[in-house]
Amino acid sequence: IFFSRDSRPGDYQWPNNTNRLLPWVFSRLEDLTRSDYEGIPSNALPSVSGDALLFELSDGEYLFAKAIAGDNSLSWFQVNQDGTITLYISTLGEDALNGQLPLLLIRKSSSVYHVFSDAYHSLTADNAAVPTLRKRTDKQYFDAFNYLGWCTWEHYHFDIDETKILNDIDAIESSGIPVRYILIDDGHIANKNRQLTSLVPDKKRFPNGWMRIMNRKQADKIRWIGLWYSLSGYWLGISADNDFPPEIRQTLYAYNGSLLPGTSTDKIEAWYEYHIRTMKEYGFDFLKIDNQSFTLPLYMGGTQVIRQAKDCNLALEHQTHRLQMGLMNCMAQNVLNMD
């Protein structure tokens, strides 16, 4: 089994833009490169660049091999048309690879279940090597996710506004269905050419900001309200034409047509502290942070690419925890986000 994303023509490939990580079954590796490989009808073929491999060996044992990330390096597999496989490691930018770097995690077991658990337990057990990785059983969901919720995306996609949401809250409450949280999922962001311009929502769609919607929270009805955002601003980063205060603008730098948090860890932390604190002050209880694996192509080609992209994830986790905000991580299925 080869683990990679589904491939779409003209789209970014691994290690970027990984919305989901899928198991692609093969008898021979070149099967994955064939045009008649039975993929997913909606998105066609597997990406030939990916995260991990699982082999059933001739002696009945299983071998699991997984690409891993370092402080400023990233590895990944590529399946070639001749049935060979290449393991790459790169900084994805101007920096050279230096010193001793993590490259690959390998485990073997007679059980297909144990080979996975042994591999990940070895990572979580090494706090010095991977201090931020924890087992799912050691994590707690935000309280709201123990209840039934409603997400605007499934009904409206981008076509939302204050009136629609308020009307739907009325409908939910009158229905008697025990919905206890709602998620406002995209369609609200102030942007210019898909770059973030403000943390104030689109004024045409939400003329009163979030106040009227937040006033609808009740302990025995809709108790929590969450909001969608993208990790790096909006889909294509942060616009130079923004309304952020001067001290926040100083945490951003211009690169490849957009502004990005960085370059130092402190500046990245300051940007996410401002971002999360603003959402908390608006009254939101949790955030869905999307587009996480697309952070890499925004930084790619520069310096300290992996480190900065990883710092964005770490700062997001740190600030949501510190400010007691719930968090959904979305489009985060690549080596950097998972490890």
Stretch-by-stretch model annotation:
Residues 101-117, 121, 152, 160-166, ...:
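Glycan-recognition patch characteristic of GH18 chitinases/ENGases
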Residues 125-138, 210, 271-275:
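Alpha-helical scaffolding within the catalytic cores
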